[in-house]
Amino acid sequence: MLEQFAELNLLRTDRTSICACRIMGVMNFIQTLAIAMGASWVSGISLYASVATLGLLSRFANLQLPGELHVLTSWWVIGVAVALYVVEFVADKIPVVDSAWDVVHTFIRIPAGAVLAATAFGDFDKSVQVIAFLLGGGLALSSHGTKAATRAIVNTSPEPVSNIVVSLSEDVLAVVSILLAAFLPLLLFLVVAAGLIVSALVLPRIFRFFRQVCRSVRGFLNPAPS
């Protein structure tokens, strides 16, 4: 009788342990997904803020970065990201300069967002990393296109105040989104979903922006004869 009771308790303990492991696995996956989504989506807005914030959170808030993102904790990486963010912070507040900055960063933010997402899933199967790479690039593309299209609209205003306000709002959104990804992942999912809806609404302007980028690249590679 005692042996049966002991076996029953052992079985219950095993089931509890299995359930606990599954719950922990789900929570870890959600955390990884949130950081991957947050890092890639924010990269389309401010890549350097995304990298610097994640690195600083890991250093000072004991945030465990998933996969191979621990490379962001390097003081060299953090220092370079902060320095570039300072440059971007200034450039982003100047009309016309901000649009030129966005054109150049079309070739930086989107690939970087894809790499950050794939790196976050570094402990997963290679196929999962490829999927994360593709989806991360798509998220960075959507947020970058929305940012650039919004700036093109704002720059039509003759006064600089609106441009500065929009830029500061983007800075706050970038940092807050990374904080949500780290500590409140479900809210981050809602923010990204809202961002995708906004991207869909301004899709025609996003297409116009990327056509402009293509024309600029063609003009640079094939300058008109003088």
Q: What residue ranges belong to the model's regions?
A:
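C-terminal ends of transmembrane helices
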Residues: V86-S99, A148-N155
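Helix-coil boundary and interhelical linker segments in multi-pass alpha-helical membrane proteins
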Residues: G25-Q31, S58-W75, L116-A132, A181-F189
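Generic transmembrane alpha-helix signature in multi-pass membrane proteins
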Residues: G38, V115-F121, K147-V154, S167, ...
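Alpha-helical transmembrane segments of multi-pass membrane proteins
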Residues: A81-A91, G136-K147, V198-P204
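Cytoplasmic-side transmembrane-helix entry/capping segments in multi-pass membrane proteins
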Residues: S99-P111
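A cytosolic-side transmembrane-helix exit/cap motif
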Residues: L69-W76, F121-V130, A148-E159, F207-L221
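Mid-bilayer segments of alpha-helical transmembrane spans in multi-pass integral membrane proteins
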Residues: P111-A120, Q129-T150, V172
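Cysteine-centered motifs
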Residues: C19-C21
